[in-house]
C-alpha cells in the first residue's frame, strides 16, 4: 500500500466539486487516510511549491493557491502515486483524457482542479507538510 497527497484546488472548492472529486477517488479504490480543508497563507503556498520558485509561473501559482480554501487529502491504495496521476489526468485539462478529473473540472493549465504528488518520495514530503502522523488514520508504516 502506498500513500499520496491530493489537493482539491480553490477553483474546484469554490464551484462545490469537493464531493464529486472525493467520490471519484473512492470509486477508484482509494481509501482516504486523512482529509482537511485549509486556506493557505502566501508563506505556506510558497513553501509547498518551493521546488517551482525559479519558474516563471511560480507567483501566479501561489496567488491561485491562496485565492480560496483547498481540501488536502492523503489517499491510500496500491500504486497510489501513479494511479492518482492517471485519475487526475494531464496538467493541461485540454490534453487530459476524457473522464479524468482535470478533463471534467479543470479550466486551464494553471486552474486545473487538483494537485497530486509526482513520486513516492515527494508524496512523503508533501504529506508531512500538511499532516502529522497522528492525523493519518491507519497510516502506512
UniProtKB/Swiss-Prot annotation:
Annotated SMART domains: NDK (SM00562)
- Under the GO molecular function aspect, what terms does this record hold? ATP binding; metal ion binding; nucleoside diphosphate kinase activity
Entry annotation: catalytic residues: 115 (pros-phosphohistidine intermediate)
Necessary cofactors: Mg(2+)
Protein localization? Cytoplasm
Tell me which EC number(s) this protein carries.
2.7.4.6
Keyword terms? ATP-binding, Cytoplasm, Kinase, Magnesium, Metal-binding, Nucleotide metabolism, Nucleotide-binding, Phosphoprotein, Transferase
Q: Name one Pfam family in it.
A: NDK
Could you name the domain of life of the organism this protein comes from?
Answer: Bacteria
Query: Mind naming one GO cellular-component term on file for this protein?
Result: cytoplasm
Gene3D superfamilies recorded: Nucleoside diphosphate kinase-like domain
Q: Which InterPro entries match?
A: NDK-like_dom (IPR034907), NDK-like_dom_sf (IPR036850), Nucleoside_diP_kinase (IPR001564), Nucleoside_diP_kinase_AS (IPR023005)
**Enzymatic reactions:** a 2'-deoxyribonucleoside 5'-diphosphate + ATP = a 2'-deoxyribonucleoside 5'-triphosphate + ADP; a ribonucleoside 5'-diphosphate + ATP = a ribonucleoside 5'-triphosphate + ADP
An example GO BP is:
CTP biosynthetic process
The record lists ATP as bound by 9, 57, 85, 91, 102, 112
Function as written in the Swiss-Prot or TrEMBL entry: Major role in the synthesis of nucleoside triphosphates other than ATP. The ATP gamma phosphate is transferred to the NDP beta phosphate via a ping-pong mechanism, using a phosphorylated active-site intermediate.
The cross-references to HAMAP family, in alphabetical order and at most eight, read: NDP_kinase
State the oligomer form and interacting partners. Homotetramer.
Q: Which PANTHER family match?
A: NUCLEOSIDE DIPHOSPHATE KINASE (PTHR11349)
The record's family statement is: Belongs to the NDK family.
The protein, known as: Nucleoside diphosphate kinase
Q: Which organism is it from?
A: Chlamydia felis (strain Fe/C-56) (Chlamydophila felis)
From the broadest rank down, the organism's phylogenetic lineage runs:
Bacteria, Pseudomonadati, Chlamydiota, Chlamydiia, Chlamydiales
Amino acid at each position: 500500500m502506498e500513500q499520496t497527497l491530493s489537493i482539491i484546488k480553490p477553483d474546484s472548492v469554490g464551484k462545490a466539486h469537493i464531493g464529486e472529486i472525493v467520490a471519484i477517488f473512492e470509486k477508484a479504490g482509494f481509501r482516504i487516510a486523512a482529509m482537511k480543508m485549509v486556506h493557505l497563507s502566501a508563506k505556506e503556498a510558497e513553501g509547498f511549491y518551493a521546488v517551482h520558485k525559479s519558474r516563471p509561473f511560480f507567483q501566479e501559482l501561489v496567488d491561485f493557491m491562496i485565492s480560496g480554501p483547498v481540501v488536502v487529502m492523503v489517499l491510500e491504495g496500491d500504486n497510489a502515486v501513479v494511479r492518482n496521476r492517471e485519475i487526475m489526468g494531464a496538467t493541461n485539462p485540454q490534453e487530459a483524457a476524457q473522464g479524468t478529473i482535470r478533463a471534467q473540472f479543470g479550466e486551464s493549465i494553471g486552474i486545473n482542479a487538483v494537485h497530486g504528488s509526482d513520486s513516492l518520495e515527494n508524496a512523503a514530503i508533501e504529506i508531512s507538510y500538511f499532516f502529522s502522523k497522528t492525523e493519518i488514520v491507519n497510516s502506512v508504516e
